[in-house]
Regions:
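A short amphipathic alpha-helical interaction element
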Residues: 49-97
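Compositionally biased, proline/threonine/alanine/serine-rich low-complexity intrinsically disordered stretches
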Residues: 27-59, 90, 113, 117
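Bacterial N-terminal signal peptides
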Residues: 13-23
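Bacterial N-terminal signal peptides that target proteins for export
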Residues: 2-14
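N-terminal targeting pre-sequences for secretion and organelle import
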Residues: 311-330
Length: 330
């Protein structure tokens, strides 16, 4: 049993019980020429830096495909997009500006795949079950699983996008099986190779994967630590990975615990407080994990652990291995 200190400030201390299989979706993407896509997809796929929001949406998708994650793709310029651009520029030997300047745009667009594609919804995509997720931990413990609350949330995680963006891209769509919708082209991105080490940078609020030559080849925005539970700086190691974890909840172990709560087992699922994967660190009670709130990554605080979007945490988990160095630095 592994104890952790890494949940959102509204939640409390949990202890990890690992299950073995990740949550998965059936996928069937149909890529089409831009001429066959709705006008918004055409505009985004042909966007130039001067095209403002269309260019930012295209850039976010290309950054995600290049493994410099902007977290939740929403088409809006913000701190996570700037971090992703900074990381991409550094990795590619470009001047670090945090902006979509011409050299950065040209480097991103070496990936010639369309940013937005048409996708045919499958029965598995909309099968659910979908149900509201209670905020109270004791109420969560009464559920069999902490799955998605809506088909839009499920599709948002599948395509690394905010549900609001999917709605904007697909006005009038009912999100029913057999329906074609426009989505970010992220499923076909290459898997990450194994890393030589992992670096967590507090000042940049990022987690990076570094190869044997010392080059950062993937970067993810993160939520980490707080005044009450600071990030445990130092040199640690990866202990292992647990996918689709369930938890034993112990309210006695957190400063913001609800005194009326009791110990309880919190079921697995994407809306579990640590999401769909836990990467265990040699520092007791600490790890890198997913989140039920991808829109808040890089914008809030944690109980000391390192929180990523579920899709970034899953991607990272496939590139690490037991014994790998994990450097947590200021």
């Amino acid at each position: 049993m592994t104890h952790s200190r890494c949940f959102p400030s509204q939640t409390l201390m949990l202890a990890l019980t690992a299950l073995l299989l990740p949550t998965a979706f059936a996928a069937s993407a149909q890529q089409q020429d831009a001429s066959a896509a709705p006008s918004r997809a055409e505009a985004v796929n042909a966007a130039k830096p001067a095209d403002a929001r269309d260019a930012m949406l295209r850039a976010q998708i290309l950054l995600d495909r290049a493994h410099f994650s902007p977290a939740e793709i929403d088409g809006a310029s913000g701190s996570n997009s700037r971090r992703a651009i900074d990381g991409f520029q550094t990795s590619n030997g470009l001047t670090v500006t945090g902006a979509l300047d011409a050299p950065t745009w040209d480097a991103l667009n070496r990936d010639a795949q369309p940013a937005l594609i048409s996708y045919t919804l499958m029965e598995a995509d909309i099968a659910g079950p979908f149900e509201p997720i209670p905020s109270d931990m004791m109420e969560k413990s009464k559920l069999a699983t902490l799955g998605y609350s809506s088909v839009q949330e499920a599709l948002g995680e599948k395509f690394h996008a905010s549900p609001a963006l999917l709605q904007r891209l697909n006005p009038g769509k009912s999100f029913a099986a057999g329906e074609q919708i426009i989505v970010p082209n992220v499923i076909s991105a290459d898997a990450l190779p194994k890393a030589d080490k992992l670096v967590v940078d507090k000042s940049d609020a990022t987690v990076s994967l570094v190869d044997a030559s010392g080059k950062t080849y993937a970067q993810f925005p993160a939520t980490m630590g707080s005044e009450h539970d600071p990030l445990p700086l130092g040199d640690w190691k990866i202990q292992g990975v647990a996918r689709n974890p369930s938890f034993h909840y112990n309210p006695a172990l957190f400063w913001d615990a609800n005194p009326e709560h009791a110990k309880a087992t919190i079921p697995p699922g994407p809306n579990n407080p640590v999401g769909v994967v836990w990467v265990d660190l040699s520092k007791e009670h600490y790890g890198i994990h997913g989140t039920p709130e991808p829109s808040r990554i890089g914008k809030t605080q944690s109980h000391g652990c390192i929180r990523l979007t579920n899709w970034d945490a899953m991607s990272l988990s496939q590139a690490v291995s037991p014994g790998m160095p994990a450097m947590l630095q200021e």
